[in-house]
Amino acid sequence: MRSYLRFSDRHRQRPTRPRKRVICSSAHFICSRMSPAATAQSPFGISLHSLSFRLLLIFRGSIVAMSRRFVYKLDQAVTAALGPNGRYIAMVGMTASAVLLTFHYKFREVIAATDNVAEIQSPSKLFYLRLLFGRTRSRITGSVMNINIMPALRDPIYRTLASVGGIDTEEIRYPLRSYKCIGHLFARTLKDKEREIEDIGTQSLASPADGVVTALGDVSSERVEQVKGATYSLRAFLGLMPKVTNPEKNTLKFVVLHLKPKNYHHFHAPAKFDVNVLRHMTGETLPVFSSFLKRFNDIFSVNERVVMSGNWKYGCMHMVAVAAYNVGNIRIDKEPSLRTNELRVVLRHLGGDVETRTYSRQPFEYSVGQHVGEFRLGSTIVLIFEAPHNFTWDMKPGQEVRVGQRLGGVGPIRRAQTEDERLFAFY
């Protein structure tokens, strides 16, 4: 009987041995991953590596007991807060958090591997913004906007949208019921004489779109204001750093125009402008309204955009159409094959290529006010151009403008003398 009891005691003690081996293995693993500095001698005459290993072995019982108490207390707290099924909810939450953190880590790893081509100041913020305002959600909204509406329902639906959104139905070229879907309504054309060129002189700059001036000024560094209080990298935004051809007489200037949903969604040439290069940079579709831009840097340099680079009277000019949330579609009249917000493409700031089209032999020649392209549901136009030091702005941030209205220029306004000079086509 005694031998049996002794055998039973030995048998009951056996399960404790693997636990000791696990703790020893864990301690060895932790210590083996310590930095080389940890192998230095401690005040006790042994290396920190060995000292840590021995301390873990000495206090292994306390560590196990503390771990058990922590798990027990955590389980009690979760059950009290979330009910009997709280532990399962917590498990799902912790799993989701682990997956999210893994994707976050991988996103930052990709940004670092591509040498941060967009010069993003906070990759973590961008990651979580992508979760909220992803390209897929913009495409879904675009699909909904392009659903055909029954002719009998178009007039009441469009009039409700117009009254809520502040759309002026009197200036729309065609009857409301002629627009098949909401997307077509936002891409509407205007009646003749609804917009005029205020200054036809070659020394001035006309507004390329209806909207609000959110920022303007001189380019003094590689980072430019997208709105007061937030900046973006000009080099990443354009794909190059623009240079002033005549630094003694000229300087680089910029202006940002935000198109609201109620605005006319087409954009026009701001001056007599020859386009030599067109660059399409794939990107996000993050919101571009002022209150959002104030809180986050680098929105312009990561959003999808089409950059038209060329020359005007005083030197270089870059006209950039920036996509926004629910506005993945950017259409350029002279490049009908251009497609934006496409599926399964590598975004520029994640290492994707820039689609470049050059027209050095036969550049696109635009006259002031000539139609260039259109958005869907509002977005942003950015102008970066070379101008003389005595170029003055006629507008201020926060001021609303209309197509053809003078943004600034050199000297007095030159008014149109004939009907042909004053009007331009919206077709």
Curated annotation (Swiss-Prot):
Domain of life: Eukaryota
List of residues that carry Pyruvic acid (Ser): 379
GO cellular component: mitochondrial inner membrane
Residues of the site described as Cleavage (non-hydrolytic): 378-379
Catalysed reaction equations from the record: a 1,2-diacyl-sn-glycero-3-phospho-L-serine + H(+) = a 1,2-diacyl-sn-glycero-3-phosphoethanolamine + CO2
Enzyme Commission (EC) number: 4.1.1.65
Presence of keyword Lipid metabolism: yes
Transmembrane stretches, start-end: 89-107
InterPro entries in UniProt: PS_Dcarbxylase, PSD-B, PSD_type1_euk
Presequence range in chain numbering: 1-77
Single annotated GO MF: phosphatidylserine decarboxylase activity
Keyword Transmembrane in annotation: yes
Pathway named in the protein's UniProt entry: Phospholipid metabolism; phosphatidylethanolamine biosynthesis; phosphatidylethanolamine from CDP-diacylglycerol: step 2/2
Cofactor(s), names only, from the UniProt record: pyruvate
Active site: 210, 268, 379
Single biological process term from Gene Ontology: phosphatidylethanolamine biosynthetic process
Free-text remark on how the cofactor is bound: Binds 1 pyruvoyl group covalently per subunit.
Pfam families with a match to the protein in the record: PS_Dcarbxylase (PF02666)
Alphabetical keyword list: Decarboxylase, Lipid biosynthesis, Lipid metabolism, Lyase, Membrane, Mitochondrion, Mitochondrion inner membrane, Phospholipid biosynthesis, Phospholipid metabolism, Pyruvate, Transit peptide, Transmembrane, Transmembrane helix, Zymogen
Function: Catalyzes the formation of phosphatidylethanolamine (PtdEtn) from phosphatidylserine (PtdSer). Plays a central role in phospholipid metabolism and in the interorganelle trafficking of phosphatidylserine.
Complex formation: Heterodimer of a large membrane-associated beta subunit and a small pyruvoyl-containing alpha subunit.
Name of the protein described by the UniProt record: Phosphatidylserine decarboxylase proenzyme 1, mitochondrial
Organism for this UniProt entry: Toxoplasma gondii (strain ATCC 50853 / GT1)
Lineage: Eukaryota, Sar, Alveolata, Apicomplexa, Conoidasida
Underlying gene: PSD1mt
